[in-house]
Amino acid sequence: MKFNPFVTSDRSKNRKRHFNAPSHVRRKIMSSPLSKELRQKYNVRSMPIRKDDEVQVVRGHYKGQQIGKVVQVYRKKYVIYIERVQREKANGTTVHVGIHPSKVVITRLKLDKDRKKILERKAKSRQVGKEKGKYKEELIEKMQE
């Protein structure tokens, strides 16, 4: 059910917006979930992927246990290139295989001050969401009296 009249649910319009999206919007679209350990640590579910993050492929032909570093984030093609995810071309040269960020899990973040700020902001908003709509014990006790 559609609630907002200003947001379209037309498939062709959504595809058009996806494939014609500017770079700053593509950054948000190219987000990856965090591993269970990082999710526990930072209380954040996903982050936009960036070069030098360590990731593990969890879907597709290249899924497996090896963890590789992100070599390049190619926003134009909506793919990332990972250290050990390569294939051999017919002429013998090896090339990186593009993988969509939603098909990987971030196992180690490359942190700088801006990224730390983003993590803090996301964790704070999640904390507010958990508290929302819950009665405090003092209020319940007062109501029962």
Curated annotation (Swiss-Prot):
Classification via PANTHER family: 60S RIBOSOMAL PROTEIN L26 FAMILY MEMBER (PTHR11143)
GO cellular component: cytosolic large ribosomal subunit; extracellular exosome
Position(s), cross-link Glycyl lysine isopeptide (Lys-Gly) (interchain with G-Cter in SUMO2): K136, K142
GO molecular function, one term: structural constituent of ribosome
Top-rank taxon: Eukaryota
GO terms for biological process, alphabetical: cytoplasmic translation; ribosomal large subunit biogenesis
Pfam families (UniProt xref): KOW (PF00467), Ribosomal_L26 (PF16906)
UniProt keyword annotation of Nucleus present: no
Family: Belongs to the universal ribosomal protein uL24 family.
Source organism per UniProt: Homo sapiens
InterPro entries xrefs: KOW, Rib_uL2_dom2, Ribosomal_uL24_CS, Ribosomal_uL24_euk/arc, Ribosomal_uL24_KOW, Translation_prot_SH3-like_sf
Name of this protein: Ribosomal protein uL24-like
Alphabetic keyword roster: Isopeptide bond, Ribonucleoprotein, Ribosomal protein, Ubl conjugation
HAMAP family linked: Ribosomal_uL24_A
Keyword Transferase: no
Region annotation (Disordered) ranges: 1-21, 122-145
